[in-house]
Regions:
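Right-handed parallel beta-helix
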Residues: 50, 55-69, 76-84, 101-167, ...
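Sensor of tandemly repeated, compositionally biased sequence architecture
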Residues: 27-29, 35-37, 74, 150, ...
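N-terminal beta-strand/beta-hairpin edge segment
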Residues: 74-75, 83-85, 90-96
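C-terminal motif of bacterial Sec signal peptides marking the signal peptidase cleavage site
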Residues: 10-13
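Post-signal peptide N-terminal segment of secreted/secretory-pathway proteins
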Residues: 15, 92, 102-104
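Sec-dependent N-terminal signal peptides
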Residues: 1-6
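N-terminal, intrinsically disordered, polar/charged segments of Gram-positive cell-envelope systems
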Residues: 18-69, 76
Length: 262
């Protein structure tokens, strides 16, 4: 199995909506981050974290936010739901890497909070990638989308979302206690996927597939079918009673194993 110790993403829920992005807290005075903020129908915040080691934390009012979209070319990404906070918290850390410049752009448009992280390679980099951690107050989302070209993704804790889409080009994906009420699509080209169901999930149709790898299923499924072709494997079935209106969970890897558990 090829693992790239690069990035991880974690997710969680939200409760408020607005388009205000605050500047970093004063406790992070050692970070050289410039912030531009426009509080209109669209709010944007652009920062360079090339010299940020410990991490820069900013807050985002999510009263008017119904969707979240995260895009990165290389990072450790974590999204966490937290019922103890009222605003979203965004933390970016460069770590010890000296080989790249990192820029993060946040914007709010049409009810969607978009977070874009881009790294520009200066020299050959052998250090850990920058990390992006997002803590969200609990609320219901229409969609949560994460797309990371290189790096691990971790989605964890409580999150109420209708559609969950998580994708990594190279890296592991871990989803814990979070599921889309209507659909969940989890994939990685090179890496493993571990999906842990929340307690007492609603009826769910499960479709697991790997081109080169194995499937470790630890959940009792109704109408289970399992197909193995040389190095490819597929598993289908229902969690709970089979229903035509069940939510769907699709997990796919090109190269890597899948673990599905309670």
């Amino acid at each position: 199995m090829i693992l790239l110790a690069a990035a991880s993403i974690g997710l969680a829920g939200c409760t408020k909506e607005s388009s205000a992005i605050s500047t970093p807290s004063s406790s992070q005075q050692n970070s050289s981050i410039s912030t531009n903020t426009n509080v209109n129908s669209e709010t944007s915040d652009i920062r360079n974290v090339s010299n940020t080691v410990k991490g820069d934390i900013s807050q985002i009012d999510v009263n008017n936010i119904h969707s979240l979209k995260i895009q990165s070319n290389a990072a450790i990404i974590t999204v966490i739901g937290d019922k103890q906070i009222n605003q979203a918290e965004l933390e970016v850390s460069k770590g010890n890497s000296q080989g790249m410049d990192t820029n993060v752009t946040t914007s709010i448009q049409d009810g969607t909070l978009q977070i874009l992280l881009k790294n520009k390679l200066k020299i050959i980099n052998t250090e850990p990638l920058p990390s992006l951690t997002i803590r969200l107050p609990y609320k219901e989302f229409k969609s949560l989308e994460i797309d990371n070209e290189v790096g691990n993704i971790s989605v964890e804790s409580e999150l109420s979302v209708q559609h969950l889409n998580v994708s990594s080009g190279t890296g592991d994906v871990t989803v814990t206690d979070v599921i889309g009420m209507e659909s969940s699509n989890i994939s990685t080209d090179v890496g493993s996927v571990e999906f842990a169901l929340p307690d007492q999930p609603a009826p769910l149709y499960v479709n697991l597939s790997t081109k080169i790898g194995t499937i470790d299923n630890q959940v009792a499924l109704e109408k289970e079918t399992n197909t193995t072709k040389i190095v490819a494997e597929e598993l289908h079935g229902y969690v709970g009673k089979a229903q035509s209106e069940s939510a769907t969970l699709n997990i796919f890897t090109q190269v890597g194993e899948i673990t599905f558990k309670n």
